[in-house]
Amino acid sequence: MQFKWVLLFIFIFTVTFHYKNILTFVGIEAGVFFGFKELYINSSGFLEKEDWSEGMFSLLDFNGDNLVNKDEFREFIREYSKEFSWENQLNDRYVFPEQLKKGAFESTLMDTTIGYYIYIPDAYHEQLDKRFRTVYYLHGGRPGNEAREAFISNYIHNIFQDATIDPAIYIFVNGGELSHYNSDELNSYGEDILINELIPHIDRKYRTINDRQGRGLEGFSQGGRAVTRFMFKYPNLFGTVSAGGGSYVIEKQIKDSEGYEDDPRDDKKNIYFVGAGNDAWSLAEQHTYSQNFTPKLMLWSGKNDMNYEGIQEYHYFLLELGIEHKFHILKDVDHNSFKFYEKDGKSLVEFHLLRSESGN
C-alpha cells in the first residue's frame, strides 16, 4: 500500500514540475499522428516531395533521401514548436565542432540573460596578438532561437581548414520573440539587443576588429530579411551583408500596408505592427538619397526556394536604384540554409573576407 502512495507522489511531482515538457511531448506526438494522417502517405509510409509545401521539402528530409518518415516529421515539429526562450540548447541530434561555445550576457534592455552561440577558430588561441573579424548570423523562423542554425558552424569549421582563408569569429544570434524586430506588443526587442547590447558585448569580451570593415552580417529567411533592413539602417556598423532566402514579398506587403506584417502563410492570422518604412524596399530607397556608406551586399537563394521569385524581384529593384550587389543562385536547393552551405558555403564565407573599404 505504501509503495502505491510513493508511486502516486512521484507521478504528481513529475506532472507538477514537468507539465510543459509533457504537454510539448503530447503536442508533438499528436502533430505527427494527425499530420501524417492528413497528408498523403505513399504505400511505404513516407511523405514525398509533392506532398509538402513547394520549396521547403528539404527542411523535413533530414537524411536527404527524398522521403520523409515519421521520425523526420517528428523532429521537424519538435524544432519549430518550441516555446520562446532567450536561452536555448543545441539539438542533441547533431554533432557540433568543439570550437562552438555557448555564451550569454545580462541584458539591461530585457532585464534577463540572453544566450548566443559563438564559433571561435583555433587561430584565435594560437595567434594571441591578432584581432579577428566577426560575422553575426541571424537565424530564420520564429520565435527566436540562437541554436536553430548553429549547425552551420560545422561547414564554417571545415572551410577554415583551408589555410588561405582568414578565419573569423561567427556569432549565432537570438532574434527575440518576433525574430529580429523590436515589438512593444510582445515586449521583445531583438533589433536593439543585437545593435546596442550583443555587438558591444562581443567586442568587449573578444579580440575583434571593432569597426565596420571587420564586421559582417549574415542571415537566412527571417534573418535574410532582417540583415537587408539593418544594412540600410546601420550602414556604419557592417562592411559586408549576406542575405539568404528572405521573403521580400512580405517586406513589400509591409511597405504597402505602412508597417503592418500580415503574412498570408501564417495560419494563426497574426498581424504585427513593425513600423512604417521599416522594410527592405523603403529603406533601400531612402538610402539612395543619403550620403551613407553602402556595405557590400550579396543576395543568395536556392533556385527551388519558394522565395526565389521575390528575391529576384528585389535584386532587380536594387539594380534600378543603383545599389551594387551580388546575386548568388544555386540549382537544386530549396529553402534550406544547411543545404546551401553544404553545396557552396565557401562562397558565403569568402564573401566576408577583408577588402579595402569602398562604397556608394
Give short role names for the model-derived ranges.
Residues K4-H18:
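Hydrophobic membrane-insertion alpha-helices, especially the h-region
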Residues T14-A30:
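Membrane-interface motif at the C-terminal end of an N-terminal transmembrane signal
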Residues T24, F73, R78-N360:
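Non-catalytic cap/lid and distal C-terminal segments of serine-dependent acyl enzymes
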Residues A30-N42, S53-G64:
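Primarily EF-hand calcium-binding motifs
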Residues G45-K49, N66-K70, F132:
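Glycine-aliphatic tripeptides that mark coil-to-beta-strand junctions in extracellular
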Residues E48-S58, K70-S81:
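Amphipathic regulatory helices of Ca2+-sensor modules
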